[in-house]
Amino acid sequence: MSPVSPRSLTLIGAGLAGCLLAILLSRRGWQVTVYERRGDPRIKGYESGRSINLALAERGRHALRQAGAEDAVMAKAVMMRGRMVHPIIGQPQLQRYGRDDSEVIWSIHRAALNVALLDLAEQAGARVHFYRRLHTVGFDAGYARFIDDRDDQPHEIHFQSLIGSDGAGSALRAAMQRKSPLGERTEFLDHSYKELEIPPQPGGGFRIEGNALHLWPRGRYMCIALPNDGGTFTVTLFLPNAGEPSFATTRTGDEALALFARDFPDALPLIPQLREHWEEHPPGLLGTLTLDRWHLDGRALLIGDAAHAMVPFHGQGMNCAFEDCVALADQLDAHDDLASAFAAFEAARRDDAAAIQQMALENYLEMRDRVDDPDFLLQRELEQKLQARWPTRFVPHYTMVTFLRTRYSIALARSEIQRQILVEATRGHRDLSRIDWAALEAVVHARLEPLDGAH
């Protein structure tokens, strides 16, 4: 084991956040070493229990720009203009995310993104070691032991500081807990998810509209499909763990076929391997992680899902983690010692992480229960009118979170005010013909200040 340099950082986890942080820090002169428990996905293929599709929003793209990684990533992304809502009876309807094609989100395959960021991290000067599972940490001595699970051989290092970018099941978080309790709490949803696939057409290309997130809302449960650049869609079914229907009552491939035939009839013929994939892919858990502390003075820090994992229903987990990376790099520039930088990072990000965790839970209810509800559709219509009239004051929730980089905590607070305005203004109305615009103008100007960045 060799001594560490004064500007060296050791990252645990070479996933998306770990690789992006490695790029940012290496470009700013840090000596960065990354340890990853799995093998190199560029050699052995990508392995993960995580969702294989992600939604990239403006705040995530901004972070990629800071790392010089945007062009490499966007070459692999597919534009999504909005939600294509599929009712049980009737034709699908597109609900645009924004005003035009300047306000869209992007679907990207997790494996392609991870490989692109890995390449860029190594090009920036970071050293990445694979098959290194964190086993033991001596925080006082600055010592860590890793195990290569191929041969059970230990590998020991000295470190100045550890940064945990190793996800919701973080090994570094577990080690920190043993040293000093972090107040860890995880609240699991009573729903889980399972992933399936829509293959491309025989001659290539998408079987359904490729530039949309497809959504089949069914009250207590729902199905979504996100496009990939190869013409496939990743389909995710979110279903209760108990009750009818649920994962408890839909265990076999044949039971899954019956569920889709009844509740998702237009999706069923698009998924030829439904029976096989249902039986091969175990359900994934959905939960929200909170901690009282994210760091151990200057010796260790958690970022991204390792610090604040969230449910996936706002498509912001990766975007939030990427924001973490930029915020941490900035705090490291602004402070002379790691303990101060880590404390400032946590103070800057804690409220925003809690806000997007709450909004992600709320968005699940909207997606599964409300997108085909007449009251919701009327409120959405009014929201668009209010944005057109007062674009810097009445900024839709989705715009603040996805197309702008408004702090999540500010977006949450403004969204709650705007929701109240929409509900009160549309109560008792079937359309907008009798809306009192003068009264609404007074309410909007009284309750909503102009928002930085809105236009």
From Swiss-Prot:
Q: InterPro entries, per this entry? A: FAD-bd (IPR002938), FAD/NAD-bd_sf (IPR036188), Kynurenine_monooxygenase (IPR027545)
Question: What enzyme category does the UniProt record give?
Answer: oxidoreductase
| Xref: Gene3D superfamilies | FAD/NAD(P)-binding domain (3.50.50.60)
Repeat in keyword set: no
Cofactor(s) annotated in UniProt: FAD
Q: Which reaction does it catalyse?
A: L-kynurenine + NADPH + O2 + H(+) = 3-hydroxy-L-kynurenine + NADP(+) + H2O
Q: What does this protein do?
A: Catalyzes the hydroxylation of L-kynurenine (L-Kyn) to form 3-hydroxy-L-kynurenine (L-3OHKyn). Required for synthesis of quinolinic acid.
Family note: Belongs to the aromatic-ring hydroxylase family. KMO subfamily.
Name of the protein described by the UniProt record: Kynurenine 3-monooxygenase
Q: What is the lineage of its organism?
A: Bacteria, Pseudomonadati, Pseudomonadota, Gammaproteobacteria, Lysobacterales
